[in-house]
């Protein structure tokens, strides 16, 4: 594990697994971190077995990165800038970017702005990107995640309850997660037509946050869509998720 300093003074944690070829940069979803989203579910191991050079970033507010409680320290653009700053820090000239849920939106922003991105794989998001410009807040409101991070966990139901259970299981800083969620109630994706790199949309068949993933793939000029088994948390654990990702990146 290592850290670098952002433009606004935060220390962000990242991990590197050495390999060959174009580096694969991973960005996890809200509440999760490198271990929860990628290592424990077998994604990193699958990429390692295929010989890839893998890098994973803990987003601000998550994992081993700094976790300010001020919502003003978070935004979609800030987190996209964090990933691009990591490219700079490591001297990366070519990258493949993989993002899940919140990380998928970040990956789209980076791919649309940075010519170093040669391939893009996104999961845990679907038609909400097309219809809402980002996370599908028709399914879960940002304020619901904020509210879920405080009070009695047993009183939180549905998708907000899922995120609360995950936060408690990971020992996440719930006040920081609430600050993240409060800052992300916007539509950062204005257009997908400029993202012309080969892209893969991966979605769980029981994930309401990734509904109609084929519509997201159709909105990207050069994308394919693959549906695997599972809900928002379980889809990444389906062996087909890692296999499809490895095949796409190889």
Regions found by a protein language model. Give the residues of each.
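Conserved HGGG/HGGXW glycine-rich cap/lid loop of the alpha/beta-hydrolase fold
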Residues: 10-66
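Flexible "cap/lid" loop of the alpha/beta hydrolase fold
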Residues: 105-150
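Conserved alpha/beta-hydrolase "nucleophile elbow" surrounding the catalytic nucleophile
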Residues: 28, 95, 99-101
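Conserved alpha/beta-hydrolase "acid-adjacent" motif
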Residues: 208-214
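Active-site loop/oxyanion-hole signature of alpha/beta-hydrolase fold enzymes
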Residues: 45-49, 56-94
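Hydrophobic, aromatic-rich cap/lid helix
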Residues: 162-188
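Catalytic active-site module of serine/aspartate enzymes centered on a nucleophile-bearing elbow/loop
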Residues: 223-250
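Short beta-strand/loop motif that positions the catalytic acidic residue
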Residues: 195, 201-203
């Amino acid at each position: 594990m290592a850290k670098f300093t952002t433009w606004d003074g935060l220390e962000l944690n990242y991990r590197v697994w050495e390999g060959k070829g174009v580096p694969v940069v991973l960005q996890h979803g809200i509440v999760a971190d490198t271990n929860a989203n990628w290592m424990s579910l077998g994604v990193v191991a699958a990429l390692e077995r295929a010989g890839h050079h893998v890098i994973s970033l803990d987003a601000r507010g998550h994992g081993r990165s700094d976790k300010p409680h001020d919502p003003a320290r978070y935004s979609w653009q800030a987190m996209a800038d964090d990933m691009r700053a990591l490219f700079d820090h490591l001297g990366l000239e070519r990258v493949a970017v993989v993002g899940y849920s919140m990380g998928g939106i970040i990956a789209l922003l980076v791919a649309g702005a940075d010519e170093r991105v040669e391939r893009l794989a996104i999961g845990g998001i679907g038609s909400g990107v097309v219809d809402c410009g980002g996370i599908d807040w028709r399914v879960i409101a940002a304020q619901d995640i904020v509210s879920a991070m405080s009070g009695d966990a047993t009183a939180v139901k549905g998708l907000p309850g899922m995120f609360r259970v995950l936060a408690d299981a990971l020992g996440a800083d719930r006040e920081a997660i609430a600050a993240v969620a409060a800052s992300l109630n916007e539509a950062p994706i204005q257009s997908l037509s400029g993202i012309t790199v080969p892209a893969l949309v991966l979605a769980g068949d029981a994930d309401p946050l990734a509904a109609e993933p084929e519509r997201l793939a159709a909105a990207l000029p050069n994308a394919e869509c693959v549906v695997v088994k599972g809900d928002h948390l379980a889809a990444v654990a389906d062996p087909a998720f890692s296999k499809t990702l490895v095949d796409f990146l190889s």
